[in-house]
């Protein structure tokens, strides 16, 4: 069974541990990086549109198969050049991140979040930039309690509340 197709270069994907939804960071070719989303109960066979689309823009290829599922978020290469997919934060140590999808850009080192709603229509592209730059973010990880980790420039970092980082 093919669960999803029409992806150019999916660079990290995850399932929301609470809802079971699929999140994919898909690296673009020329100018757009995208975040793709598939709700748990929507079934297999999603066509994310590559090579007919890059992000929400027509790319010139031919759309094969079913209808195109556009990304829930995208950004241009003026903000970075290679998305690194992350996780929906379900931990307890950083309350402001609860229920938000956290992802990054490899080239700029920027980390962003966006709200993960209770349904596909509830996903919001209200992307907020976290006030941190880590360098080349290559991957995220999720601990058994839902806490997030990020790998950048050969180091493993753990997400904690700002006061905890200063005090600890």
Residue ranges of model-derived segments:
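Beta-propeller domain segments
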Residues: 1-127, 157-167
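Blade-level signature of beta-propeller repeat domains, shared across WD40, Kelch, NHL, RCC1
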Residues: 138-167
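Conserved blade-ending motifs and adjacent loop-strand segments that build the rim/top face
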Residues: 7, 121-144
